């Protein structure tokens, strides 16, 4: 079997001589290595460029967190494991920046201790057990010094502190606690060792919160020299962060974006090729981590300018059936009558306006860092799927002049739509599409599906990176192929 992304990462770091260690949460390291997940790596600052070039060669991409800001010397990288098609998160530290969950308002001078005295365990460099225990107790107690941090800790572990205490018991193995006094004296001399051991026992025995809170305040006072910001500044930062966090959650957004910027990715193809399924799956997959928006460009919402006309046209088409054109992407033969041609042309212009408005909104989101996933995408190719519809009439006359004016206006609107950054063009044999259509809740006529596969052009975008994907394969295989294409495009 092909080595996992994490295995290749560890092998690469070792072969290139990058000085690093997995500096925290090592109680769950085996699970993280097996499933990918998140790795917390402390990397020596002089090796930063070497490390980043190594992970870039493995397909990792730098990501920024807009909500929590950019902590100095702390970065996020994400990579796609080819075996599982799941994301691997590297939380990379060039300084020991830690502390509370939200602010991480402390920077401890422990890099040398963790890196120079690390040991190799199952292919991963880990810090000395006593050093990891010492820092764990300090980090845990700092979370008790703030009511907000305490509530976050309680929310994440409603049954108490089982996970916290389980990690503590893991770190207490091999008599690591006995060496903490020596390490404190050498590396954090401001911390009283008796207070440290009292804090350790308070966590271990699940002391009442009032006692833990008081001990945490005392410890925090002794760590004043290691703060990144003053108490007043930290309070303002916390208030701002909580407000922004509430706003982003209300909007249903994630805070991480690719450092290289956002991207508009379009799924295009005939009927029953799996566009909607893949858009939904992709938005759900990337939306667990990134700021993602999805939209259907074939059926755009009305703008304030087109709301009433769209409503009026809908009523007219239902109330007066003979006004409907007999050839309106249905695949049925025949030509619309004069009045139907006018109604059809008006509807086409309004649809072009709405599609352009939606495409421009999505483009603005992408250039501001968001990943945009589109179900279909319009083009200026007349007659192509979900694209311009109207041809300029050859015949002359007042009536044809009006239709020609509408056609030119519609074509111009489509030319103003910016192309997507990447296109995934889905294909399946027509007989498979017909079969899939029959399995839908809302079925189209079989003739319509055949017509869309054989007689209607798929829009093309010369300036966009276009990849063809055959979706006539097992669902999981199609999804994994789409994920690899999308990750390469970001």
Place the predicted regions along the sequence by residue.
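Hydrophobic positions on the alpha1 helix immediately C-terminal to the Walker A/P-loop
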Residues: 278
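NTP-dependent small-molecule kinase module
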Residues: 209-211, 215-237, 430-490
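Conserved NTP-donor binding/palm subdomain of two-metal-ion nucleotidyltransferases/polymerases, i.e.
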Residues: 1-37, 43-263
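ATP-dependent small-molecule kinase phosphotransfer cores
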Residues: 300-398
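P-loop (Walker A) phosphate-binding loop of NTP-binding proteins
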Residues: 269-270
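Short beta-strand-centered segment that lines the nucleotide-binding/catalytic pocket of NTP-utilizing
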Residues: 288-305
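A glycine- and Lys/Arg-enriched "phosphate-lid" helix/loop adjacent to the NTP-binding pocket
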Residues: 376-455
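Conserved lysine of the Walker
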Residues: 275
